[in-house]
């Protein structure tokens, strides 16, 4: 069943409403630009159902993006690994699989779609896996990558890390 917004509210809003409406035991997300192949889905599904991962993220190990996108992506993934202590190589790959309980336990807003693995970890889901997926040239749409994302990304990461560590007791940040 599809959900149609009156306008484009962004990827986080789309994921959030999809997670709210989902009913299956396993939820798969994938970007509509088809840079990831639907043929990868059965293996992700198996990793959730048989290998008992809470979340499995795709890893575009070999990328077909311009140099101007791959360097910032590597920096982003390094910073996200350090801030979250999650050993993923590709936090932002749109191809992911989740147990239903994971997507029902997190709320995604703003630009937090980049940090779903961290949000899941901070919600108590620590069995996070990764699978190498084939990256393909974009078939549809245009990239949203730009200076604004590069500047806001670190601020969002700080927010997620802060909420993960101090969300339930924010005064502990001040030593209280």
Question: PLM features: what roles do these ranges have?
Answer:
Residues 1-3:
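Acidic donor-binding segment of Leloir-type glycosyltransferases
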Residues 5-7, 11-21, 38-119, 136-155:
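Acceptor/aglycone-binding surface of glycosyltransferases and processive sugar-polymer synthases
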Residues 27:
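Short aromatic/hydrophobic "clamp" motif used to bind/position activated sugar donors
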Residues 31-35:
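The conserved acidic donor/metal-binding loop of glycosyltransferases
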Residues 81, 160-163:
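Structural signal for membrane-spanning alpha-helices in multi-pass inner-membrane proteins
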Residues 128-131:
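Conserved alpha/beta core of the MobA/IspD/sugar-nucleotide pyrophosphorylase nucleotidyltransferase superfamily
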Residues 162-176:
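Alpha-helical bilayer-embedded segments of polytopic membrane proteins, i.e.
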């Amino acid at each position: 069943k599809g959900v149609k917004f009156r306008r484009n509210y962004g990827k986080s809003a789309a994921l959030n409403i999809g997670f709210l409406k989902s009913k299956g035991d396993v939820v798969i997300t994938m970007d509509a630009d088809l840079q990831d192949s639907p043929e990868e889905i059965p293996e992700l599904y198996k990793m959730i159902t048989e290998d008992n991962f809470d979340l499995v993220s795709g890893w575009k190990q070999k990328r077909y993006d311009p140099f101007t996108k791959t360097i910032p992506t590597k920096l982003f993934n390094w910073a996200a690994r350090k801030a979250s202590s999650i050993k993923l190589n590709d936090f932002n790959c749109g191809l992911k699989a989740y147990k239903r309980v994971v997507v029902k336990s997190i709320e995604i807003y703003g630009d937090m779609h980049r940090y779903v693995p961290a949000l899941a970890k901070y919600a108590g889901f620590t069995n996070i896996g990764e699978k190498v997926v084939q990256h393909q040239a974009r078939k549809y749409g245009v990239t949203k990558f730009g200076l604004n994302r590069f500047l806001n990304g670190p601020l969002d990461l700080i927010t997620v890390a802060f909420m993960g560590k101090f969300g339930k007791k924010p005064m502990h940040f001040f030593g209280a």
